[in-house]
From Swiss-Prot:
Signal peptide: none
Species for this entry: Arabidopsis thaliana (Mouse-ear cress)
Tissue note: Highly expressed in leaves.
Subcellular location: Cytoplasm, Cytosol
Protein name: Protein ECERIFERUM 26
Protein purpose: Involved in biosynthesis of the epicuticular wax. Plays a role in very-long-chain fatty acid (VLCFA) biosynthesis and is required for C30 fatty acid elongation in leaf. Despite its classification as a BAHD acyltransferase based on sequence homology, CER26 does not seem to share the catalytic mechanism of the members of the BAHD family.
Region of interest called Disordered, as start-end residue ranges on this chain: 1-36
InterPro entries: CAT-like_dom_sf, Plant_Fungal_Acyltransferase
One Pfam family this sequence matches: Transferase
GO biological process: cell wall organization; very long-chain fatty acid biosynthetic process; wax biosynthetic process
Disulfide bonds: none
Record key words, sorted: Cell wall biogenesis/degradation, Cytoplasm
Record carries keyword Cytoplasm: yes
Length: 428
């Protein structure tokens, strides 16, 4: 479980926890269901996390009532996300759209926003996201948790824990942005979620039938928690894009290479220097699908690709690794087929099955304005990661910077941070 769950026992910097439930105002027609795709089912042990921090000037006058009323408006648009999972006779999970609601969590913090943001390791923001996995009683388990944390100065932290089975990270950001608009008093509209037939993925590269970016794990039953033998640790930091590109990547004026691949290549090298791995080495890249026609729908449509190299990564140049990432193979079709074929009765991990890089750099996380003001800081991560680890790269408050959240086995983290220092990713 995530660090934030511990605060329920009064531990950590967030205290005075109160839980309630928020749902849609309009009842869903009896018997309505939402059917997950094979890709959805493959992601069922993963949970997405986001925490947005707003200043006292922005949020001081916002009350619990304001936030809940805006959530009513949001869930009127996407009411199926407030349902609960059940199983068919075959064992296949599906959502009963029974309007059971989302869990709303209130907490207090004795620090000001300025004091909170002064902490160099931003993984402290995990405390702003209340997480609880689905299960062991599926019919009583919310799919989304929303946490409101009031700072001493009047500032506000808004955190979401979002079951990946209902939609990818881009779906989470879309839903949060709608909520932020509703908080401000804007009218919001979300298009109807596509049918299961429209949501099923048709691969442009159907030759990839045996995806290596997904790993089967021991059966977990109805408690959807990734089984790991190793304890994982989080580390989050900001870096300057220019400082990393100039010394490590002689681009020679070529502006076509995305920043994400360059940063991922540098971080991949740092991790490879700590790990002794036989060749070939494979990593997973997860990105937004640029060709997705249903851009504003709650669904899993992210591109999940594998990158394999047959040379020592630790000794490779960043340019070689960027080139390899440009040849990534889209494996969604194979993952979709695996999820469909087992009817959700087998359990898998994608994040951390191989070392995984999640690209969120194309998302303007700071457009989530409340009362006309952007958040002071945004944090993103994933819960339920496999033992190979995850690197998330996303926008910072300053356009010339990026934020990197790293989750690795605890035994590796300090050695990897030493490599980060050698490469100038973090201060010595």
């Amino acid at each position: 479980m995530g660090r934030s769950q511990e605060q329920g026992q009064g531990q950590g910097p967030v205290h005075s926890i109160r839980l309630s439930t928020v749902g849609a105002t309009r009842p869903t027609e009896t018997g309505t269901t939402h059917e997950p795709t094979g890709l959805d089912l493959a992601m069922k042990l993963h949970y997405l996390k986001a925490a947005y921090i707003y200043s006292a000037e922005t949020a001081r006058d916002l009350t619990v009532r304001h936030l809940k009323e805006a959530m009513f408006m949001l869930f009127d648009q996407i009411a199926w996300t407030t349902g609960r999972f059940s199983r068919r006779d075959s064992g296949r999970p599906y959502i009963k759209c029974n309007d059971c609601g989302t869990r709303f969590v209130e907490g207090q913090c004795n620090l000001t926003v300025e004091e909170w943001l002064s902490k160099p390791d931003r993984s402290v923001d995990e405390f702003l996201v209340y997480h609880h996995p689905i299960g062991p009683e599926l019919t009583f388990s919310p799919l989304i948790y929303v946490q409101m944390t009031r700072f001493k100065c009047g500032g506000l932290g808004l955190g979401l824990s979002w079951a990946n089975i209902i939609g990818d990270a881009f779906s989470l950001f879309y839903a949060f942005n709608l909520w932020a608009k509703a908080i401000t008093g804007e009218k919001i509209y979300a298009p109807t979620t596509p049918s299961i037939g429209e949501r099923r993925f048709q691969s442009p590269n159907p030759t990839v039938k045996d995806p290596v970016s997904i790993k089967r794990v021991e059966p977990v039953g109805d408690l959807w928690v990734t089984p790991n033998d190793k304890k994982l640790a989080n580390y989050c930091f900001n870096l300057s894009v220019a400082d990393q590109i100039s010394p490590h990547f002689p681009a020679k004026g070529d502006d076509s290479i995305p920043v994400f691949e360059i940063l991922a290549g540098i971080i991949w090298k740092c991790i490879a220097k700590v790990r002794v791995e036989p060749k070939p080495v494979t990593v997973t890249i997860i990105k937004k699908d640029p060709n997705d026609l249903k851009l504003n729908a709650i669904r899993n449509s992210q591109v999940i690709s594998s990158v394999s190299v047959d040379f020592p990564v630790a000794e490779a140049t960043v340019e070689e690794l960027v080139k390899a990432m440009g040849e990534a193979k889209d494996e969604r079709c194979g993952i979709e087929e695996i999820g469909e074929s087992c009817d959700g009765n087998l359990d898998f991990v994608v994040y951390g099955a191989k070392l995984t890089f999640l690209d969120l750099t194309g998302e303007d996380l700071y457009e989530a304005k409340v009362m006309g003001k952007s958040p002071e800081s945004v944090y993103c991560n994933v819960e339920g990661i496999g033992e190979e680890g995850l690197v998330v790269v996303y926008a910072a408050a300053k356009s010339e910077e990026r934020v990197v959240t790293v989750t690795l086995p605890e035994e590796e983290m300090e050695r990897v941070k030493l490599e980060f220092k050698k490469f100038g990713l973090i201060a010595p």
